[in-house]
Amino acid sequence: GIIVRMAAAGEKIELLDGKTIKLNSEVLVVADHKSPVALAGIMGGEHSAVTSETEDIFLESAFFEPIALAGVARSYGLQTDASTRFERGVDPDLQLDALERATALISEICGGEIGPVSCSSPDKVMKLDHPIQFRPSSVNKRLGTNLSSSDIIRNLESLFFKVTQRSEALWEVVSPSFRFDIRAEADLIEEIGRLSGYDE
């Protein structure tokens, strides 16, 4: 089977670019029962590469916490599309849909038999839908606008945020999974300003 784990100190992997690197115990890898097959979220390994002789493939559709990969690629002198994408963050809710779509396309174009899905996830799954404490009164103060509560809610909900009014003065707002860039009240106010216009 395929697992995701931390590398053993001194473990080595030959990457797709031909470079062999020595890993430390802070590096996340995708591995089989013997050794790493990929530097997680950065680059695949040469010994698991697809060739013209390949008959069986294993598709990876992953989410890695940006903090787990931050700086790892650069520390090995690597910069890949994958490392850039994962360091910036990807939607953690799309993995299964993406895997199903890719599998369907491969099956349609190339034929073949589709195998089972296996999942590797940590014991403690990261909670991604942290509610943001939001004071609606801050919107008009910061933006110089005169928006009503219903205007603010309409703006947020149009961007797929979930709003719960705990009281008139304090709301909780949960970002959609694809908006991992929204972390604080100021980010929400910026989104409202962008939608409603800063000169209202």
Task: Give residue spans per PLM region.
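RNA/tRNA-interacting regions in translation and RNA-turnover enzymes
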Residues: G1-E200
